[in-house]
Amino acid sequence: MSSLPTVLVIGAGLAGSEAAWQIAQAGVPVRLIEMRPIKQSPAHYSSEFAELVCSNSFGALSSDRAAGLLKEELRRLGSIVIRTADSHAVPAGGALAVNRASFSASLTKELSAHPLITIERHEQEHLPGEGQITVLATGPLTSELLAENLRTFTGRSECHFFDAASPIIEGESIDLTLAFRASRYDKGDADYMNCPMDKGQYLAFREALLNAEQAELKEFDKESAKFFEGCLPIEELARRGEDTMRYGPLKPIGLWDPRWGDLNDRDVRRSKRAYAVVQLRKEDHEGRLWNLVGFQTNLKWSEQKRVLKMIPGLHQAEFVRFGVMHRNTFLEAPQLLEPTLQFSKRSNLLAAGQITGTEGYTAAVAGGWLAGSNAARLAMGLNTITLPSTTMIGALTHFVSDSDCFRDRKGEFQPMPANFGLLPELAERIHAKRERYGAYRDRALTMLEEAQQQWGMSKAPVQIGSS
């Protein structure tokens, strides 16, 4: 029986799962509270931990990409979520995509079996007392009662935007006489299903999107409805201009069906090249289920079925999940948090994940790792830590705790995904982009290793595919 105080983690999403694991692995007991299935959120379907409600992709794998560097840092820090994602990966070209069902089930099983983690299934309606070390990892779908209590505690109204999830269809219902398998620019294996459109099909599809009936927003949301630019509903993209979708998720560049002829023949290429292409990505290794890439939507389910069947190759599509839209809540973190992810006004309360204003699955995991590590250190009477801003984890946590950080044109704090623009400039200017990103990576991993040595953190690189 541990003599250390028990840490409370509220929320068993990506950030909360990571935080709970890091705390327990440090030898500190944890109470992990998850309200599902006692109370479901508007977007979740199961009671499993770390359920992925939007895409099944964690983004780029290559460490010379910002999202890939973030994952590599987390592997070296012993992240359970990234380890599990690697173990449940499905083919996705240069991205880390997972079988979302087996991924969540595996995490739930491992966390539930840990001797220092106690699972509690109920809604946490308020913040615990001041003596309790707590990690708040309730995510963008924080329950209203807790959100109201948080507003009272911070003295601020929370920020929000609207997020949406893409539909999923059965692979057997895709017409392979019209669709073809390929990865963009032939990178990796042919891991994506591609549905090409000519100009007439594209314009008719866009017109159908513009005229389709949307699901009704709650009255209090209608006037303040705004979207995160990195995850716009497909109908919102259609509204922004005739070619917006073609330069976004439906871009045809780098995709070629061998049945069209010789790609190297200029005349064939000009006459056969698709005007737009809808891509689908595997949900599972066998390809039984596929999600429509970039097709977040708030259309009514009946309208999704009608409009999306206009896509060539999907005229007989069988839907296993329709797209949904939900309100995402996040804190005005730069006014509330320290770079350690502790609240400025209460040092034993920490926040992690998308509620802090980071964007993306891997960034949520990174916040969970840091908040969990610091909660464990508080329980052990040690100083809390930060990671250097030259690392991607450090850059993200400094971003959400910097009162001078980037704001939109209205002066409002907005979520930010991992990107190299967050990192300090290199000592020497490198003009070639690939070499520059490689230099950012090399510096980040060197600084991470130095930080691990400074703070006595064990080096824990994780082999991809290990369990």
From Swiss-Prot:
What does the record give as the reaction this protein catalyses?
uridine(54) in tRNA + (6R)-5,10-methylene-5,6,7,8-tetrahydrofolate + NADH + H(+) = 5-methyluridine(54) in tRNA + (6S)-5,6,7,8-tetrahydrofolate + NAD(+); uridine(54) in tRNA + (6R)-5,10-methylene-5,6,7,8-tetrahydrofolate + NADPH + H(+) = 5-methyluridine(54) in tRNA + (6S)-5,6,7,8-tetrahydrofolate + NADP(+)
**Cofactor(s) this protein requires:** FAD
Statement: the UniProt record of this protein carries the keyword Cell division: no
GO cellular component terms, alphabetically, are: cytosol
Q: Which GO terms describe its molecular function?
A: flavin adenine dinucleotide binding; tRNA (uracil(54)-C5)-methyltransferase activity, 5,10-methylenetetrahydrofolate-dependent
- GO biological process: any one? tRNA wobble uridine modification
Q: Does the keyword NADP apply?
A: yes
Which InterPro entries does the record associate with it? Answer: FAD/NAD-bd_sf, MnmG-rel, MnmG_N, TrmFO
Q: Which residues bind FAD?
A: 11-16
Q: Where in the cell is it found?
A: Cytoplasm
Keyword terms of this UniProt record? Cytoplasm, FAD, Flavoprotein, Methyltransferase, NAD, NADP, Transferase, tRNA processing
Per the record, the domain of life is Bacteria
Identify the EC number(s). Answer: 2.1.1.74
As for what it does, the entry says: Catalyzes the folate-dependent formation of 5-methyl-uridine at position 54 (M-5-U54) in all tRNAs.
**HAMAP family assigned to the protein according to its UniProt record, in alphabetical order:** TrmFO (MF_01037)
Family from the record: Belongs to the MnmG family. TrmFO subfamily.
The protein in question is named Methylenetetrahydrofolate--tRNA-(uracil-5-)-methyltransferase TrmFO
Originating species:
Prochlorococcus marinus (strain MIT 9303)
What's the gene? trmFO
